[in-house]
Amino acid sequence: MLSENEIKILSYLKLKKKANAEEISKELGLPLSSIFSLAKLLEEKGYVKIGERKIIRFELTEEGKKRLKEGFPEEILLKELNGQPSLIEDLKNKMGKDLEIAISWARKKNLVKIDQNRVIPNTSNYTFSTEKEALLKPESADEKVLQELLSRKLITRKEESKLEITLLKEEFEEQNYITQLTSELLRSKDWKKYKIREYNVEALPPYFPLAKKHFFRDFIEKLKDVMKELGFTEVNAGYIEMELYNFDLLFQAQDHPAREIHDSFRVDGLGKIDDERLLKEIKEMHEKGWKYSWDPQIAKRLVLRSQTTAVTARILSSRPSVPFKGFSLGKVFRPDSIDATHLIEFHQLDGVIIQKEFSFTDLLGILREIFYKIGIKEIKFKPGYFPFTEPSVEVYGKIEGLGWVEMSGAGLLRPEILKAMDIDANAGAWGIGIDRLAMLLFGLKDIRLLYANDIDFLRKMKVRL
């Protein structure tokens, strides 16, 4: 059974025998996409054969148009020489930057020779008619001339594929079909002139993809849900932070390499610190622990936070009620070369537990529970070092196909830090690189794909937590 539009296509092909899809679309006034699908249906029914014909087109570039109008550089050079030798310096004053190109091509064509600082013509009657004809009609140009024009970027070559439809059966039933009976058709009895189209009750409806969140944003939201389910309170702070919270309060010395300009983004201006007691305690902590003269002006410098542990530092400085369980998940910034595994802007999750009897064993237990809920069932711990925790631990998770991969750094906060914050309790803290974790869980080879906007790619990505 043929549809009305299928009959239109066959009727047109009956006259032409063969036509491309664009031509049929234009003549029948049907969308090109409809011609493609209808041709496929007709091919399945044996009425037509679909083929592909490659068409090569050449187009003049802006430089090509210029040369057609003004002449080739070597052509202009010959005109300037007018059959007589000339100094390169004199020619350069007249032709400018085109002289180098002109000499290069003129020598290739044996039109000139160079003798010391002079250009000497070998001919004065060379015509450029072949090259100009090739610019006007590249399709019929000599292959050697064509390649020259292409290499000089005077023309571009474009290859197009045309869908060509050939009629196989000239006999077909030119019967009009209707899809529904109307009261007018019944009254006038005109329905007898038509065939009623059959319905395929087994046909599936068209697929309409539903809207959904970007998979990485969804992943971050689900991580937050995991932390909240475990009783943690989300705490946020700004991206611009004083070095006091980003470094000093975390017992990182003021001469530490991480504080250099190449490891953190500096921001103009200075912050303000009103808590004199806090400054005094931090000064004592640094000068006693690191044996140097601590400078409060350095602590006031502003940076784009390089770790969300800066939020943990702010939590501690606010002297929260004990017990306290908090976390922060947000962007951090570090100078780096962007590639498949590095970005200058990425996400971290930091957590802190402040509790009277909180132990190192308790910390390992909560880390194990967090990673289990994320979907990493097997983890192991190795001793580590971080300036603001002691003891410290590195957390490794087992990822299918990759083996053991580092996931997090953690530890109990140093007594000096807790004393400076006037906190009479133990505290455990940890940090997780979220972008790297997402790469591993989603099986991505390129960290930049976490921020992809390719719709087909995004539709395939699913978050399973």
From Swiss-Prot:
Annotated residues for binding of Mg(2+): E390
Cofactor: binding comment: Binds 2 magnesium ions per tetramer.
Enzyme Commission number, as recorded: 6.1.1.20
Keyword Manganese listed: no
Reactions the enzyme catalyzes: tRNA(Phe) + L-phenylalanine + ATP = L-phenylalanyl-tRNA(Phe) + AMP + diphosphate + H(+)
Subcellular location: Cytoplasm
Single Gene Ontology MF annotation: ATP binding
Gene3D superfamilies: Bira Bifunctional Protein, Domain 2, Winged helix-like DNA-binding domain superfamily/Winged helix DNA-binding domain
PROSITE patterns: AA_TRNA_LIGASE_II
UniProt keyword Phosphoprotein, yes or no: no
Chain sites annotated for binding L-phenylalanine: T309, Q348, L349, D350, F388
Annotated GO CC locations: cytoplasm
Primary localisation category: cytoplasm
Keywords tagged on the record: Aminoacyl-tRNA synthetase, ATP-binding, Cytoplasm, Ligase, Magnesium, Metal-binding, Nucleotide-binding, Protein biosynthesis
Matching Pfam families: TrmB (PF01978), tRNA-synt_2d (PF01409)
Domain of life: Archaea
Cofactor: Mg(2+)
GO terms classed as biological process: phenylalanyl-tRNA aminoacylation
Subunit record text: Tetramer of two alpha and two beta subunits.
Family that this chain belongs to: Belongs to the class-II aminoacyl-tRNA synthetase family. Phe-tRNA synthetase alpha subunit type 2 subfamily.
Name of the protein: Phenylalanine--tRNA ligase alpha subunit
